[in-house]
Amino acid sequence: MKRILAVVAVSLSAVLTAPPALAANPHDPPGTGQPGEYRPVRGPSAPSEHRFLQKTLRGQDLPRHAYDLAAAQAARLPTTGGAWNLLGPSNIGGRVVDMALDPAHPDTLYIATASGGLWRSTDLGATFAPAWPADLTQAMGAVAAASNGTLYAGTGEANPGGGSLTYTGTGLYRSTNGGATWTGIGLADSGAIGHIAVDPRNPQRLFVAATGSLFNPGGDRGVYRSDNGGASWTRVLAGATDTTGATEVLFDPTNPQRMFAIMWDHRRQPNLRSYSGLGSGVYRSTDGGNTWQRLNSLVLPAADLGRIGVGIAPSDPRRMYAIVGRGPASSNFFDGFYTSSDGGDSWNRLPDNEDLAESQSSYAWWFAKVWVDPRNSKHVHVAGIALLTTRNGGQSWTADDDSMHVDQHAMVWDPDHPRRVYLGNDGGVYRSEANGDGGWIKSQYQPFTQFYSGAISPQDITRESGGTQDNGSLRSWGRRGWDEYVGGDGEENLINPTNVNNVFACYQYGNCFRSVDGGNSNTFFTPATTANRRNWFTPVQFDPNDPNVMYYGGNRLNRSVDNGVTWTPISPDLTGGPGQDAYPFGTITTVAAAASDPRTVWVGTDDGRVWVTSNLGATWTLRLSGQPWVTRVAVDPSSASTAYVTLSGYRAGSYQPHVLVTRDGGLSWTDLSGNLPQAPVNDVILGGGSTLYAATDQGVFVSAAGDGVWQRLGTGLPLVPVDDIEYDPGHHRLVAATFGRSMYELVI
């Protein structure tokens, strides 16, 4: 179905004249154009707002169940095309949020990934195979295995990082056949499941920490108990506020009637990140969860009390440890590390430690995990940017930030092998045979990397690269495996279509590099550009007529005619600018030069504007405004006045277009969203004839006639967000960069 958007006609047009060329200020820090702000390649910079701001509409919460409602719409569409094939990487990994060893099957390890589903290993974590249906949400929060081999999985990530957005889940699931099939068993309105605890003496008795929706109050929050293997549930501990959920439930290893629950008061509002509150705290039950008492001896209720992590020593359950985050609403700093020797009746705050504090940075809510050696009550590991370890009960600490990836989230000891420990972090799965004190071995096969972008070469179908969440910019030359060649959060990646060794890669906030030797050596070129603001994902593009001509978008558009060595601004500020409200908008998000007219360039912005110039930036005309975040502009190769625009944003209660086309240079627009799911469209590609390909949060879709009638494209692609698609018409292939399942390829 097509809709004509008459409201966005000529009346919206505005003409701006480009300013004279400005030299980059050599004293400005690279990356943001803002004095004093520099984002390091690796280190303690807080997770950005980028993904939350992109997926929501200004002033609105992310609607409850928006993701799974859109997924249901996608499932109803017919499918066309062949099978998608995994391109990789499989050796890099991605964020692991929980893990569990199967008591009934030795050496069988299950891991839950942030947006890549559930996986199983039977070879000491060396390789992993999917243990989760491809057509269910891939956003996971928890996994647990009962003594009889029954598996429980909680959906929805409980860690609110990764761009300040988590994909909500659809509740709790159970499998009795090692993950071959799964059955939903309730708590569908939980938003995210933080932890599942199964009574080691009774596999029918389990507790679930329902963390709740990050974006909406209420729902299934708190601690739930089932005495019949998940057939029915009772909430046994509710939060003190409607934004308080549970993050963890712990059994006393010697007495399963004695339990502890950690509660966290938090919410991501449209213009505020509230990650602390009066509802945060630790509770204890001595009667199997029937009643609970708050442990005020640890910390008193407070508006600035953040996320807490607790560990119990299996060899001495009276000894406990707690790490506490505290701070203003938008951040949690390290408050302190506490220990108890009487089962939580009283607590002592241990002396401050610089390594421990630095490991939590300004976002202690990203970690909040304490793991105690089952055989040594003084040997403790703590999650942080690095892995922190004490061997004397917290009196001194060492930080391991060399032998594994940053950002630790999960750990489990193998009960059959006393010194074997598994660790999960933003780089995947690691194993240590030294009790977690070094000697970490990374998994060889874990294809669940979160991609922001992809790049391919029409000259060589064995060359791919892409930017990833917390795993840098990755490359695969000749299908000989993948490696990181630029660090940080990888963003834009490009491969020159006429020279496979001329590649470009960026990390966050437009810190970009060019290379003429395939990325072996890289030259930082951002200081040569001119911008006051740069997006977390700053667009860089080749001109389709000449790859020596390039474009770089900050709040102004920059142009290079020497393959990115020197740059000249060719526009004024094309955004509404910052500071009008609490939203840090004001950057260009997409650039498209016309193949049929090298003087015509289209630009989209994060504050919903689309501009066009037909004279290489001498003047600019506003052709669309008041829209959600513009994710892509694609220009018809044969007509500079025909442009396709894709929009982000989940909306509740009313229709939101996500694909628009103009055939008259932006004087009028037609809605081509048609039967697409009501969800963000992240990219659009023009295929042969009138064919359109769209990448969305629910996969890839095709409109054969370009008329708004869409079908799901291909089989075998999991239900995972696809942030970028690349088309190689000469080899008839489409490559999808997914946010959670690495890259896939489809022959079309």
Residue ranges: model-predicted function:
Residues 1-4:
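Positively charged n-region of N-terminal signal peptides that target proteins for export
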Residues 7-17:
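Bacterial N-terminal signal peptides
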Residues 15-25:
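C-terminal region of N-terminal signal peptides and the immediate post-cleavage residues
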Residues 26-748:
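Beta-propeller blade termini and top-face loops
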